[in-house]
C-alpha cells in the first residue's frame, strides 16, 4: 500500500516535471524564434540602414509591414531622396534591396539574379496548391517556352477570333442599351478579357464555358489571397498551416475543379493525336514521299492551335499538370491585361477628344485592313494611350524582382550580397527628367515620340527599357506582352467604336495602392451607352 502511494507520488512529480520541461522548451523556442525574426533582417543587410525600420515602441516588424502596405510609393520617394542609387527597405513580406532603374541594364540578363527563387519564396512554391511557382519546375519551362515560341508566333491567326469574343463579351456585359447606364467597369472587362484569352488558350467552345471562365477569373484572386494568409505564419509551419487555412483549401479545390473540366478535353486531344500517328504510319510507303508531306500538312491543319495543344508539343512527353499550366497562364495574363484596359478606359472617360481620334484610327485601320496582325500594329495612337496608361500606373511601382544566388558588384561599385531580394524601381517613369510634364496623362505622348527619327522602337507598348519597366526588362521581361497588347487593342477598338463613355458623378476612379502593387479602381463604375458604330467590326472591310 505504501509502495503504491509512493509510486503515484513519483508519477505525479514526473508528469509535472515533463510538463515543466515542455513549457520551458516552448518558451525557449518562442524566444529564439522572436529574436531571430527581429534580428534576421539586420544580419542580412550587413550593417546597412533599413528604411521603414521598426519604431522605438515596436518589438516586431508588424508595424513596418503595415506601413509599407499603406504607403509604399511615399516610402520609396523618401528613401530615394536620401539614397538615389539603392536602399534596403522592409516591405510587407521581408527586407528587400530597391535599385534605381539605371541598374536595370545590368540586372536584365545576369543569371545571378534569379527570378525563380524569388517567386518560389514569395509565393510558397514548395507548398501544395502553390506549385505553379515552384523553382526549376518543368511547368515553368513549358509555360515560358510555349508562350514565347508558340503563342507569340500565332497571334496573327487569333486577332479575328479575339474580336469575335470581344463582341460577344461586351454585348453580354455592357448590353446594347442606347440609354446611359452605370456598370462595374473592372469586373465586366475582366470577364470579357477572360473570354478573349480563353479562345486562344483553350479554344472553342471551352472559352465560353461559364464554369471554366469563373475559375480562370477567380483562381488568381484566390491564389494571392491564400498566399497573403500564409505569410503571417512562420516559415517552418506554413506547409502545415496550408492544409487547414480556408483560402488554401479553396485554392486546391479550384485547381481540382479545373482539372476535372480540362481532363476530358486533353484526353480527346491525346487520343486523336495517337490515331493520327497510327494512320500516318499505316499509309507511309517508301515511294510515296509526296503523300507523306501532304498527310503531315493535313495533320497540322486538323490539330487545334491553342495553348493546350502547344503545351503538349512543348512538353514533348515530360510530365506536367495541364490544368495548372492553364491556371498559370491565366494568372499571368488575364488580370494584368484587364487592369491595364480598365485604367485606360478610366483615362478615356474624361477625354472625349481622344476617344474621337481613337475612333477615327480604328475606322481607318481596321476598316481598310480588317482584323489582321499588321492592322493591330498600325493602331499607333491606341498603342500610345496604353503605354501612357502603363507609364503612370504600372501594375507595381517596382519590377524585375530577383533573388541573388551569389555576390554581385555593379560597374559603379555597388555590392549586393548573395540571397538578397532585389527589385528595380519604376520611379523614373514619373520624373520630368525623363518625360516632360511627367505627372500629366498625355495619350499622344508616345505617338509624337514615335514619329521622331530613331524613336520608332522603344516607344511601342511592347518595348522595354531602363525608363519604361511596365513589362519588366531583359530575359525575364513578360513573355506574354505581345499577346496582352493585342488583346487590349482588340477590346478597346470595340469599346470606343460601340460605346459612349463617361465617369459617374459620385465616383472617382482613384488608384488602389497595396504595398508595391497598384490597381485600377475595382469598385468604381462608369456610365456607358450603345452608339451606332461607323463600321461593322464583324466584317469591317465590307462596310467602309
Swiss-Prot record:
Listed Gene3D superfamilies: Cytochrome P450 (1.10.630.10)
Record EC number: 1.-.-.-
CDD domains: CYP503A1-like
Similarity field: Belongs to the cytochrome P450 family.
Gene this chain is encoded by: cle2
EC primary class: oxidoreductase
A GO term for molecular function: oxidoreductase activity, acting on paired donors, with incorporation or reduction of molecular oxygen
Function description: Cytochrome P450 monooxygenase; part of the cluster A that mediates the biosynthesis of chevalone E and its oxidized derivatives that possess a unique five-membered lactone ring and can synergistically enhance the cytotoxicity of doxorubicin (DOX) in breast cancer cells.
Cofactors required: heme
Keyword Membrane belongs to the record: yes
Practical applications: Chevalone E derivatives produced by this cluster are interesting candidates for cancer therapy since they synergistically enhance the cytotoxicity of doxorubicin (DOX) in both MDA-MB-231 and MCF-7 breast cancer cell lines.
Phylogenetic lineage: Eukaryota, Fungi, Dikarya, Ascomycota, Pezizomycotina
Protein name: Cytochrome P450 monooxygenase cle2
Membrane spanning stretches: 19-39
